[in-house]
Regions:
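Anion-binding and metal-coordination hotspots
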Residues: 66, 73-86, 96-485
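Short, solvent-exposed coil/turn linker segments
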Residues: 17, 35-39, 95, 185, ...
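Generic alpha-helical segment signature
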Residues: 11, 24, 37, 58, ...
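Hydrophobic alpha-helical membrane-insertion signals
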Residues: 1-29
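Basic, short loop/linker segments at the boundary and entry of helix-turn-helix/winged-helix-like folds
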Residues: 24-67, 72-73, 380, 384
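Short amphipathic alpha-helical interface patches used for protein-protein assembly/oligomerization
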Residues: 90-94
Length: 485
């Protein structure tokens, strides 16, 4: 039967409770119940005057507003405020009633600029929520997955300028330099000159070398990232670590043009002391410096197979066998490549004899050198890379590496698809750190809240079942006693 009463209740006056308007299984309700939000007062206490000025907005409400934005992937703060005005669940979560005025969309931005800009407040919020996850024994940091994703910056690709910038130094450069000098001394070679005294251009792997790069005039702190063969954008690189259950353990933010292997140390320092036994990462982290760092710290590095960067039709490096006793390489034609020098990048160079190679039947498959000399390089920390290869072939490691798509890659996919992580509307690295910190806090807290809610439901079911069984047993015993008498 057709019923037409859509407009009858619009002007009714009703009495209701805000708490009754939000379903018991609503996401914001279980999130609000999962954690005590009063910890925010302790974090921001020193940012407010205790007895001067006008009464401020509640700091918990202030933090919850961007929390709603990142939790539901709302594109801007302006749109978030519009959603809060008409959404009862949002108002309930913020502690507002139906007649309270919603803060202006610039309120959070002004408070950020005046109070939170140069602080680590949002990282502390992320850490506090992670501690709650540890408290319930949900996090297992023995196997950690590390990867980086790029978030598009709010910068026009056409508004740029070229600048000369110094390349960031490798985090292990000082240790590598000592190792190079030690190796050259063992081979009776002179130590390398300092860069200031060297007439040659510094090597590409060392810090201090200058290079021309593209810089955005809108967001100079972002980096020019080559997204594909025909696509380049200004972006930020978000390096992230998570455990095998998908709990986010730490993160760092860098310009999009920084390589993952150069920025790894910052993330690794944040993860120190949590009990990592195995660290799983993609081929971008498969460098001797990282392998040495992990193995020396007692951590098992798990890296994938990396295809040799050799021209098609030429012998790959594995065809040249290294003789550890005589410190030389033997080519496929059983000729010796002897040690020549150790370069500034930490690679020992081994060269063949040009006169012998000139008559070699494999010359065209070996080298294109005009003087017929074959060059093979070996890093001073090559034994660490060989250990990584042995680990890769260990039973069970292939299956463990395959879990990346179920952990760190799924995490990135969820953040981009549902939490506005594909791009940022904010300018500057500091604001990007705020966005990443709150987004990852949302992901961890949402997962924690759902698991706690499921545990409560399970406990209530078990409690009801136990009471039912106890009642049945009591009735059974009573009937037996009555029958006996």
């Amino acid at each position: 039967m057709l019923t037409k009463d859509a407009d009858k209740k619009r002007e009714q006056i009703q009495l209701f409770c805000m708490d009754d308007m939000v379903p018991q299984d609503h996401l914001l309700r279980i999130i609000d119940k999962a954690i005590d939000w009063s910890f925010i007062y302790e974090l921001v206490e020193e940012k407010y005057s205790p007895d001067q000025g006008r009464p401020s907005m509640d700091p918990v409400t202030l933090i919850k507003i961007p929390f709603i934005q990142y939790l539901y992937g709302i594109k801007s703060m302006r749109q978030t405020i519009k959603e809060i005005e008409v959404n009862v669940a949002y108002r309930w979560f913020l502690g507002l009633d139906m007649f309270d005025k919603v803060p202006h969309f610039t309120t959070f931005g002004k408070n950020y600029t005046r109070r939170f800009k140069d602080t680590d407040l949002f990282e502390q919020i992320f850490t506090k929520i992670l501690e709650e996850c540890y408290k319930f024994k949900l996090v297992d940091p023995t196997e950690v997955f590390v990867d980086a994703t790029h978030v598009k910056a709010k910068a026009n690709n056409k508004k740029m300028q070229k600048r000369i910038a110094k390349q960031e130094a490798l985090f292990y450069e000082d240790i590598l330099r000592k190792e190079i000098d030690k190796d050259r001394d063992a081979h009776e070679k002179k130590p390398l000159k300092d860069k200031d005294d060297d007439d040659h251009k510094p090597s590409s792997g060392s810090g201090g070398s200058e290079k021309e790069e593209k810089s955005s005039t809108t967001d100079p702190e972002s980096g020019w990232f080559h997204k594909g063969e025909h696509k380049s954008v200004f972006a930020y690189s978000v390096q992230t670590a998570c455990d095998k259950n998908g709990w986010i353990l730490g993160y760092t933010i860098n310009p999009g043009n920084y390589h993952d292997s150069r920025t790894f140390k910052g993330l690794y320092d944040k993860l120190s002391g949590i009990g990592i036994k195995t660290l799983i990462a993609d081929a971008g982290y498969k460098v001797p410096g990282i392998a040495k760092l992990l193995i020396d710290d007692g951590i098992t590095p798990l890296f994938p197979y990396k295809r040799p960067q050799t021209k098609e039709g030429f012998f790959q490096k594995w065809r040249y066998v290294y003789d550890e006793y005589y410190d030389c390489y033997i080519c496929p034609n059983d000729q010796v490549l002897r040690y020549v020098t150790t370069n500034r990048n930490g690679y020992k160079e081994y060269k063949s004899c040009g006169t012998v190679c000139a008559t070699c039947p494999y010359l065209r498959e070996c080298t294109e050198s005009k003087d017929h000399v074959k060059l093979v390089t070996r890093h001073v920390w090559e034994e660490y890379m060989e250990k990584c290869e042995d680990i890769r072939h260990t039973i069970g490691m292939k299956e463990l590496y395959a879990q990346r798509k179920e952990t760190i890659e799924r995490l990135f996919g969820t953040a981009k698809e549902h939490h506005g992580f594909r791009y940022t509307q904010m300018i500057g690295k500091a604001r990007m750190e705020m966005k990443v910190g709150l987004t990852y806090a949302c992901l961890n807290l949402k997962k924690l809240a759902k698991m706690k809610h499921q545990r409560e439901l399970l406990n209530s079911v078990i409690s009801c079942f136990n009471s039912f069984i106890a009642t049945k047993i009591h009735i059974k015993r009573k009937s037996v006693l009555e029958f006996a008498f």
